[in-house]
Structures are given as structure tokens and as C-alpha cells.
Swiss-Prot record:
Keywords assigned by UniProt, alphabetized: Activator, DNA damage, DNA repair, DNA replication, DNA-binding, Nucleus, Phosphoprotein, Transcription, Transcription regulation
GO molecular function: DNA binding
Name recorded for this polypeptide: ARS-binding factor 1
UniProt source species: Kluyveromyces lactis (strain ATCC 8585 / CBS 2359 / DSM 70799 / NBRC 1267 / NRRL Y-1140 / WM37) (Yeast)
Pfam families referenced in this protein's UniProt entry, alphabetically: BAF1_ABF1 (PF04684)
The keyword tRNA-binding belongs to this UniProt entry's keyword annotation: no
Posttranslational mods: Extensively phosphorylated on Ser and Thr residues.
Similarity comment: family membership: Belongs to the ABF1 family.
Gene of this entry: ABF1
Length: 494
């Protein structure tokens, strides 16, 4: 892309060269006078020019908004004294592009209207909060406007490269160009940084309640845009106003974020504290005031200090009582733990002796029970065989044999009861002894209690079946008996 130079009566190659007649370079009495020239150049070319760097309010570097463009201007202070700031860095309100002196007068008029609107709203009882915020913004704007002074020169261009490498047709439209200049207007013309800083330092956190739409309408930024860039009322439609408000919101958010990163805006405000936190801050703040300063305070503040001091003493007493209660409870708990540990030691020794005795008794009882169960098992088997042999005596059995069978059954039942009682007594003895869980488990695994109990259940069920069958046979025998009435008289005596 070939380089081209936009034709302008001031911003050209001859700006850095001395005048042939006077042998001096063209100078600008103030920094705002230089910004008047830059603003006109931007407006005609639709190409934003930005302040790229500055040093001690004496040296400034301006460049095209496109990084690849070689356009560059170096502006330096020429004079013995400089009424501006001598600190390093860009001057306050000069990190963007500047504005004209005529727009500065409009800027003051806008602030006056804003202050009057703030006072009018302050008289409205239904909008106390809105009026307070508006008044705070108006006061901050007025303070910044009164404290700012014009940076005096003279300033001269020491170096200029007036060529662009992008075509003029690719530059911005008028509305987009105006939107790109909103940060410069906020920073230079309206001193928006100082306004936001004043609002951030407000105890009521006014910056959080800042209404951008109200600021756009009342700050004078619309008047500056109309006068400087020639926008008509039709061009300042709702979409344009919305885009302007969006630029203001972005600028405000970036400023507050920078303050938070620097740690200046990191402290919580009074309305953000909870009740407990608020009292805690006051609780630590007022006792730190020396006594001789407290006597110099007003009477109301002295009462507040004394009240919070009493609250502090009461809280300390409550903490001491709570600590003593906790300590006493802790001592009782420690003593209880010590006694429990002593009892556990003695119980462990007793448990060892008991386990030895129980193990020996369990072994002896298991051996005796095993021999007894073997003997009882043999008796039960023999009895079961006898009962099974007697099952053939169901019908037609004489009375003597039936009685003998009943006596045998009773004997078997009695033997069954005795065996059951012995087993239950042995189980109760085993349950009365406090045997270790492992010993009891091993004994249950090795003892034949389960087999014996199963045999007893089988025998009991078998006896019930035999008894039921016997009852059936008795009924049948009764039916087969011939009544005495039906017997012939000659046979009754037989």
C-alpha cells in the first residue's frame, strides 16, 4: 500500500520545520490549543489520532489508531518554566486525546446545569436517594472543573511523520468516529477520571449507584459532540445515545477495576458491612483513640466511644466466662478419660484371667458334653428303632400289648424330655460364662449341638405322628367293639 498524506493546513510536513521568515517553528501557547488542531485533523480525515506516550507533561507522542500505520507526531515543551505537573507519566486527563477550549466552555456550562438539576432533585422528597447521588456527582464534577488548570506552553512539534498507509475510504464513518472519541472526551474535556475517583472515595459508595443514562443527558457530552463534530439531532438517535452510554459504562468499569487492582478501592464500604462486621469495625476502631483525643471529641461521639468501650468490656467478660467454663469442662472430661483408661487397664488384666479360666472350663464342658451326647444319641437311636418296630401294632392289638406300647411310648417321651433338659442346661451354663467371642464361635463350629437338635426335632415329629396314628387306631378299635346290649345273654358271663 502506497503512503499518502491527508491535506491539512497545519498538520503537514512543514510543521516541524522553522518558518523561513521568522526562523522559528510554529508553537502552541497551551496544550489545549494543540488539541484543537488535532481534533480538526481527525474530524476531516475520519482517522482517530491517539496519545501514545507522554513524559512529565513536556513530551508527547501522538500516533494513528492503527498500529501498522507510520503516522507519528512528537510534541515537546519549549520554555523556561512549566506550570503543569512535573511528575512522571501522562498528565491527569491526557492519556487520551484532548479537546478544544470552546468545548471546555460548553463543559463548564454542562456542569452548571448538572449542579442545578442536582439541587432541584434534592428538594424532591420522593427521590431522596436519586437526589443524593445526583448531588454527589454534581459536587465532584464542579470540584474537578474548578481545580483543573490549562497546561501552559509553548509547545512545538519536534518531529512529524504525516503519512498513512491505509486508504482514506477505509476510515471510519462519522458516527463510528465519534464513538471512538468518547473516551477522549470523557478523560480530557469532562475530567471523568477525577469525578470517578471522587465518587469512589465517597463513604456512601456513590460510584456503585452511578447512573450512566443520567450522566449522558446532564454532563454536557452531547453538546460537545454536536458542536465539535457537527452531528444533528436526527443523527443523535436512540441507537447513537445507547452506544454513547455503552462507552461511558465501559470506561467507568475499567476505571473501577483498575482501582481494585491497585488496592485503593478494595476496602468494603459501610453499607456493605453486615451488622456483626459493622460493630466489629467500630469495636476495634474506637478503643484505639487516645484518651486525650477522646476528650476533644464532641459529646455525641464521646458517648458512642464510651458505649462501644463498655460493649468491649462486656464481650471480654463473656469470653473469659466462656473460656473458664470450657476449661472446667475440659478438666472434667480429662479426669473422666483418665478414670476410664485406668478402669480399662484393670478390666484388660481381669479379662485375660477370665479368658484363661473360661477357655479351660469350656474345653472340659465340651468333652463331657461330647461323651454325654454320644451316649444319649445311642439311646435315642435304640428307642427310635423300637418305636419303628412297634408301628406294625396299629390295628387289632390286644389291650395288654396296647398298654405296654403306651408305657414304652411314655418312657421314650420321658427320655426325650430328660435329654432336652440336659442339653438346655448345658447351653445355659455356656451362656452364663462370659466367654470370648472367638472361643464361643470356635465352640459352636466344633460342637455337635446342631446335629443333636436336628435329631431331637425328627424324633419329636415322629412321636407326634405315632400318637396321631394311635388315636386313629383307638377310634377304629372302639368302633369294632360290640356293645354289651348286642351280646347274647348266654355269652355275657364268658
Amino acid at each position: 500500500m502506497s503512503l499518502y498524506e491527508y491535506k491539512h493546513p497545519i498538520i503537514n510536513k512543514d510543521l516541524a520545520a522553522p518558518d523561513p521568515v521568522s526562523a522559528q517553528k510554529r508553537s502552541f501557547p497551551t496544550l489545549e490549543a494543540w488539541y484543537d488542531v488535532i481534533n480538526d485533523y481527525e474530524f476531516q480525515s475520519r482517522c482517530p489520532i491517539i496519545l501514545k506516550n507522554s513524559h512529565k507533561n513536556k513530551h508527547f507522542t501522538f500516533a494513528c489508531h492503527l498500529k501498522s500505520c507510520p503516522f507519528k507526531i512528537l510534541l515537546s515543551y519549549q520554555g523556561a518554566n512549566n506550570s503543569g505537573s512535573s511528575e512522571d507519566g501522562s498528565p491527569h486527563g491526557l492519556s487520551g486525546d484532548g479537546g478544544s477550549s470552546s468545548s471546555g466552555s460548553n463543559h463548564h456550562n454542562g456542569h452548571t446545569n448538572l449542579a442545578e438539576d442536582g439541587r432541584a432533585e434534592d428538594e424532591d422528597d420522593d427521590e431522596d436517594d436519586d437526589a443524593a447521588v445526583t448531588a454527589a456527582i454534581a459536587a465532584a464534577v464542579a470540584a474537578v472543573a474548578d481545580s483543573q488548570e490549562t497546561i501552559k506552553g509553548p509547545f512545538v512539534v519536534t518531529k512529524i511523520e504525516p503519512y498513512h498507509n491505509h486508504p482514506l475510504e477505509s476510515n471510519l464513518s462519522l458516527q463510528r468516529f465519534v464513538l471512538s472519541k468518547i473516551p477522549k472526551i470523557l478523560q480530557v474535556d469532562l475530567k471523568f477520571d477525577a469525578i470517578l475517583e471522587s465518587l469512589c472515595n465517597d463513604d456512601d459508595n456513590t460510584v456503585a449507584k452511578f447512573r450512566v443514562a443520567q450522566y449522558v443527558e446532564e454532563s454536557g457530552i452531547l453538546d460537545i459532540i454536536k458542536q465539535r463534530y457537527g452531528l444533528t439531532e436526527a443523527e443523535m438517535d436512540k441507537k447513537m445515545l445507547s452506544n454513547i452510554a455503552r462507552r461511558v459504562t465501559t470506561y467507568k468499569a475499567r476505571f473501577v477495576l483498575k482501582r481494585k487492582k491497585d488496592g485503593v478501592y478494595a476496602m468494603p464500604t459501610a453499607h456493605q458491612l453486615t451488622g456483626g462486621d459493622h460493630h466489629q469495625v467500630q469495636h476495634h476502631h474506637h478503643p484505639s483513640i487516645p484518651a486525650h483525643h477522646q476528650h476533644q471529641l464532641p459529646e455525641g461521639q464521646q458517648r458512642d466511644v464510651q458505649h462501644h468501650h463498655q460493649q468491649q468490656q462486656q464481650q471480654l467478660q463473656h469470653q473469659e466466662q466462656h473460656q473458664s467454663h470450657v476449661d472446667s469442662g475440659h478438666n472434667v472430661y480429662q479426669n473422666r478419660i483418665g478414670s476410664i483408661s485406668d478402669n480399662d487397664d484393670s478390666a484388660i488384666h481381669n479379662l485375660d484371667d477370665t479368658n484363661v479360666r473360661v477357655a479351660a472350663a469350656a474345653a472340659a464342658a465340651a468333652a463331657a458334653l461330647q461323651s454325654r451326647e454320644n451316649h444319649d444319641t445311642e439311646d435315642l437311636k435304640r428307642t427310635l428303632e423300637q418305636v419303628q418296630d412297634d408301628e406294625s401294632l396299629d390295628v387289632g392289638v390286644p389291650d395288654s400289648k396296647r398298654q405296654l406300647h403306651r408305657r414304652e411310648r411314655d418312657r421314650v417321651a420321658e427320655a426325650l424330655k430328660m435329654a432336652t433338659r440336659d442339653i438346655l442346661s448345658n447351653q445355659s451354663v455356656d451362656s452364663d460364662v462370659n466367654v470370648d467371642v472367638d472361643l464361643v464361635t470356635g465352640h459352636k463350629q466344633l460342637s455337635p449341638h446342631d446335629d443333636m437338635a436336628e435329631q431331637l426335632r425328627l424324633l419329636s415329629s415322629h412321636l407326634k405322628e405315632v400318637e396321631a396314628e394311635e388315636n386313629v387306631s383307638d377310634n377304629n378299635l372302639k368302633k369294632d367293639d360290640i356293645p354289651d346290649e348286642n351280646i347274647q345273654p348266654e355269652l355275657r358271663g364268658q
